[in-house]
Amino acid sequence: MLQFDLLKTDPSSHARRGQLTLNHGVVQTPIFMPVGTYGTVKGVMPRSLQEMGAQIILGNTFHLWMRPGLDIMQSFGGLHGFEKWDKPILTDSGGFQVWSLGAMRKITEEGVHFASPVNGDKLFMSPEVSMQIQTVLNSDIVMQLDECTPYETNGHKTTEAEARKSMEMSRRWAKRSSDEFQRLGNPNALFGIVQGGMYENLREESLQALVEMDFPGYAVGGVSVGEPKDEMLAIMAHTPHRLPAHKPRYLMGVGTPEDLVQGVADGVDMFDCVMPTRNARNGTIFTRYGDLKIRNARHKTDHQPLDPSCTCHACAGTSGVSWEQGGRDGFSRAYLHHLDRCGEMLGPMLTTIHNLHYYLNLMQEVRNALEAGNFTEMRARFKAERARGV
């Protein structure tokens, strides 16, 4: 099931405040969804995710099909029982991962033939197979199988003709995904994915075709795939707000804090990205006042937490009181710099907790601003604070 209630709109942008009801719970939008590729958000316990305000997380259809496999997943009743997460889950279709295999795969109208990256077995992914896998996973939101249109094809920018061919196949796969989803009697919700590369006319065609299929929700795919930032922003400005207003809109794989706030202004309700978790493991920390590189030697003796305004466990400890509010229970930059230098696993665990908390809290601030009718002021303050630097 899926029910989307549009609660409030912003008069000066396309931003919306909504509520999404799914089989495993209610999600307040706009929302950021942490990525749990292999059935876990790397380095974070489910309890910690709930404490920091995560309402819905992602799982990766392709990787969970490879390992542990459908037999094991089915024995646990799906992904929720396997990873002990009782809130909603969205699974991608596996299309992006198959596309990423490059020379190891062959895409045809029927589907994708590829060699398993785990053991080399010859495998086949089709819209029908993707729906069958995601039905076993029992995710609340299922994504159609699509072909991710690359920004470059054979060393040149993907032409309009190449993008059209890819988009039209994704459109046909959307229909096959929908037919199989219904045949299986899946009780969850299937989203269609708008493709078309960097060509607005193709995006418009894809969008209209998917709207005619009447999916419960829609995603904008094929962005953040190597294109220049200005071209990504142009697609964000063009496509999301043209999707049906009474259904949720999901921007796949985006992005920085600035991208999220801009995406909300462009009419997006749902975001996911590996950036907060991956960057945390590589020493880049997102803070209210800009990005911090914890490996920089200047943090070696710094007593401040990662973000003096933050109330996450890394920055505020068990008290939950930020440094700016007088709290001194959080871990210092000096300590986290030390953990990183020594390769201690606690380091990336704490920085991941912080980065995810930052993203989730940013979305809470956006929701609060939309409810209060001051989203424009919130955006201006956000930009000014992020530009200040740490």
Curated annotation (Swiss-Prot):
GO MF term list: metal ion binding; tRNA-guanosine(34) queuine transglycosylase activity
Bound cofactor: record note: Binds 1 zinc ion per subunit.
GO process terms (BP): queuosine biosynthetic process; tRNA wobble guanine modification; tRNA-guanine transglycosylation
Positions of the UniProt region annotated as RNA binding: 253-259, 277-281
Residues that bind substrate: D92, S93, G94, G95, F96, D146, Q195, G222
GO cellular component, one term: cytosol
This enzyme's EC code(s): 2.4.2.29
Pathway: tRNA modification; tRNA-queuosine biosynthesis
Catalytic activity: 7-aminomethyl-7-carbaguanine + guanosine(34) in tRNA = 7-aminomethyl-7-carbaguanosine(34) in tRNA + guanine
Keyword Glycosyltransferase: yes
Superkingdom assignment: Bacteria
InterPro entries: ArchSynthase1/Queuine_TRR, TGT, TGT-like_sf, tRNA_ribo_trans-like
UniProt keyword terms in alphabetical order: Glycosyltransferase, Metal-binding, Queuosine biosynthesis, Transferase, tRNA processing, Zinc
Cofactor: Zn(2+)
List of residues binding Zn(2+): C310, C312, C315, H354
Gene3D superfamilies assigned: Queuine tRNA-ribosyltransferase-like
Cited NCBIfam families: Q_tRNA_tgt, tgt_general
Assembly information from the UniProt record: Homodimer. Within each dimer, one monomer is responsible for RNA recognition and catalysis, while the other monomer binds to the replacement base PreQ1.
Annotated PANTHER family: QUEUINE TRNA-RIBOSYLTRANSFERASE
Family of the protein in this entry: Belongs to the queuine tRNA-ribosyltransferase family.
Function: Catalyzes the base-exchange of a guanine (G) residue with the queuine precursor 7-aminomethyl-7-deazaguanine (PreQ1) at position 34 (anticodon wobble position) in tRNAs with GU(N) anticodons (tRNA-Asp, -Asn, -His and -Tyr). Catalysis occurs through a double-displacement mechanism. The nucleophile active site attacks the C1' of nucleotide 34 to detach the guanine base from the RNA, forming a covalent enzyme-RNA intermediate. The proton acceptor active site deprotonates the incoming PreQ1, allowing a nucleophilic attack on the C1' of the ribose to form the product.
Protein name (record): Queuine tRNA-ribosyltransferase
Record organism: Delftia acidovorans (strain DSM 14801 / SPH-1)
Native organism taxonomy: Bacteria, Pseudomonadati, Pseudomonadota, Betaproteobacteria, Burkholderiales
